Regions:
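Divalent metal-coordination and catalytic microenvironments
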Residues: 42, 70, 85, 100-101, ...
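Active-site neighborhood of divalent metal-dependent phosphoester bond hydrolases
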Residues: 74-163, 191-198
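N-terminal active-site segment of His-dependent metallophosphoesterases
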Residues: 2-84
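Active-site environment of divalent metal-dependent phosphoester hydrolases
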Residues: 44-49, 73-76, 102-107, 176-177, ...
Length: 263
């Protein structure tokens, strides 16, 4: 059968070769819609650092804040950060959250009822002071799922990649030999490969864009420039007590800027 006829009959496209569970949700944005754009990653329960950063950058409703995954685990105020993010969204702030591998594990726990064992490593209440105020066993039986239903729904709707006019944001990394829609889920969530080194197979669409990722912590507490246009912005907040932020757009000035807060 002629390939073009095959495509028309079966509505074939490249994505159909990718198993559903491995498909990556890509959200495309117009960066011209925002006055300033900020990116942070891997908060890991460091709620106080998050508040310090919001105060320092003086986020406005005309701006955009991207969080590149891994709000939860390690630190003691994971759930508080999620609640703060949702409150900001409801108040009209532009905040986009990209799924991290720790959120992916959290969702898997809920799919398999692992939260019923509240001592599991990634249980939402083991990593949040919010739930320490409750009688866990009693609360579990009465309204646990009702209380966190909003969070699970929100996380399920989050993209794994956000692509703008000049910038790409992802949690762990990319395969630069594949376009965004053909990235593998496990790779964008988990990779620690030095993907920026594969210059020979890099597609043209990546050559003129900055790429920002997290997942692999910089234990000196600083943002790391991996190549001309690729940055690791995970400053290891839980370990270093330092949170780095990249201002990737400011309509009043040119270039990018690193911003830090400490506690």
């Amino acid at each position: 059968m002629d390939l073009e006829l095959f495509k028309k009959i079966f509505k074939y496209n490249e994505r159909s070769a990718i198993p559903m569970e491995n498909r990556v949700k890509v959200e495309r944005i117009d960066e011209n819609n925002y006055d300033r754009i900020f990116a942070i990653s891997d908060l890991h329960g460091q709620y106080d650092l998050f508040l310090k950063l919001l105060e320092k950058i003086e986020l406005k409703r005309e701006d955009l804040l991207l969080i590149l995954g891994d709000i939860c685990d390690r630190g003691k105020k994971s759930y508080e950060i999620y609640m703060k993010c949702m409150k900001m969204i409801k108040l009209g702030y532009n905040l986009k959250f990209i799924l991290g591998n720790h959120e992916d594990m959290l969702l898997e726990d809920f799919e398999n009822d692992y939260p019923l064992n509240y001592e599991t490593e990634y249980s939402i209440y083991k990593n949040s002071k919010y739930f320490e105020k409750k009688n866990i066993e009693k609360w579990h039986k009465e309204n646990f799922y009702a209380e966190v239903k909003w969070l699970i729904k929100w996380l399920k709707d989050c993209p794994l990649i956000v692509c703008g006019n000049e910038n790409i944001f992802v949690h762990a990394g990319l395969d630069l030999s594949k376009n965004l829609e053909n990235q593998e889920r496990e790779n964008v969530l988990w990779t620690r490969e030095e993907f920026w080194m594969d210059k020979k197979n890099t597609l043209e669409e990546y050559k003129n864009k900055n790429i920002y990722f997290g997942h692999t912590p910089n234990l000196d507490g600083k943002i790391s420039k991996k190549s001309d246009k690729i940055y690791d912005i995970d400053c290891g907040a839980f370990f270093t007590h330092s949170l780095g932020c990249m201002e990737v757009k400011n309509k009043k000035s040119k270039g990018i800027r690193e911003i830090y807060v400490h506690c």
